[in-house]
Amino acid sequence: MQDFLTNWADAALTTAGFFWTAFWAFCLGYVISSAIQVFVTEDRMRETIGKAGPKSVGLASFFGFLSSSCSFAALATTRSLLAKGAGLVPALAFLLASTNLVVELGVIIALFLSWQFVVGEYVGGVILILLMWLIVRVTRPERLVERVREKLETDGGGEPEDISDLLKSRRVWEKLSRTYAMEWQMVWKDVTVGFTLAGIIAAFVPAEFFTWLFPGTGQEGDPAFLQVLAQAVIGPVAAFFTFIGSMGNIPLASLLFANGVSVAGIMAFIFSDLIVFPVLRVNASFYGWKMALYIAGVFFAALVVTAVAIHYGFAFSGLAPDIGASGGLPEPSDRFGIDYTFVLNLAFGAVTLAFGWLIWHARGDGGGHHHDHGGSSWGEKLLRSLALLSFVWLAAGLVLRLFLGGN
């Protein structure tokens, strides 16, 4: 019983640590997404990245490189790009770049894994984008994309604003604030449940369980090709049940690597943050299930091929990383400290409070609108119930942590 209570407390603190690490990235991504929705015209977006040419894909990838690494924030921005007329390939290139090519992700990988995985992440990110482009070109989902655009236009937020009005009109700030709040309203349930499950898995499930999933792990010599391919396919399955996000799954990836999982399995696990269930749900709420499953299928095929290519690229070059070089998960309490995350969280917390004040003030003046995206389907009701249960679980676990003490 004591072990269960200790793990419960660790799970709650781990979840809190994951969210603490990602909060500023969520906020940054949703600010960018909100700004695109409020200020960018459809004509400008179509002109910039409206077609799947090298320039459009390159620009979209560069914008993704500069953006937040948070999966949910990237999803929101991608939806905004599509709604404003961006082509499917450039929009998906932005999504892949924002979760695979950002600088902070490389830093985290270097800390938990090794330099080879940093190279694999960035080279693999480029390969993912090129393979995605090829798959979309072959499958030609034009009719599906048109239906998605019709849905996004129906859900649109009215005429765009002039960004210069930020300096002279509080109404524009209020509109930006409402859009920002709507971004959070659409994903808070998925984020809460996903991060809570990640904390539970990190605390209760031993690393040996995940290494058991990957055939060829722990054997003498290099795994055979079919074992490498199987590990690349199973990597997304493991990620599906351990969703944390493009940043948070790196510590779990280090545990897999420390227990002998191949480079292909690790890279596939890392690349899989965009095809797990919470992400599928968010995409389905944006585009419908058919489009969400299409995107997941494209990403799955691309990441399996990419992971295998990276594995053999290192093997043939003699630069394969040494098994056992990773350090594993940090202690739950080690995620909280006075560092850049603390400063950024304070800054974006202040931005969020300011937006909240603007929304409240607009309602007090009779302005603003109330938006309810909760829905009434059984799936939405179930997810809301799970999110509320997650809050109870986390609150009780954090209280336990206070009584139990320790790291």
Where are these regions (language model features)?
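Short, strongly hydrophobic alpha-helical membrane anchors
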Residues: 1-15, 407
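Alpha-helical membrane-protein architecture signal
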Residues: 8, 12, 55, 59, ...
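Alpha-helical transmembrane segments in multi-pass membrane proteins
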Residues: 21, 25, 29, 33, ...
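Hydrophobic core segments of alpha-helical transmembrane domains in multi-pass membrane transport
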Residues: 30-35, 126-136, 194-202, 235-239, ...
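Transmembrane helical segments that form the transport core of multi-pass membrane transport proteins
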Residues: 40, 46, 177, 181-259, ...
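Juxtamembrane and boundary regions of transmembrane helices in multi-pass small-molecule transporters
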Residues: 51, 56, 116-161, 282-368
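Membrane-interfacial helix-loop connectors
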Residues: 65-123, 206-299
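Transmembrane alpha-helices
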Residues: 340-366, 372-407
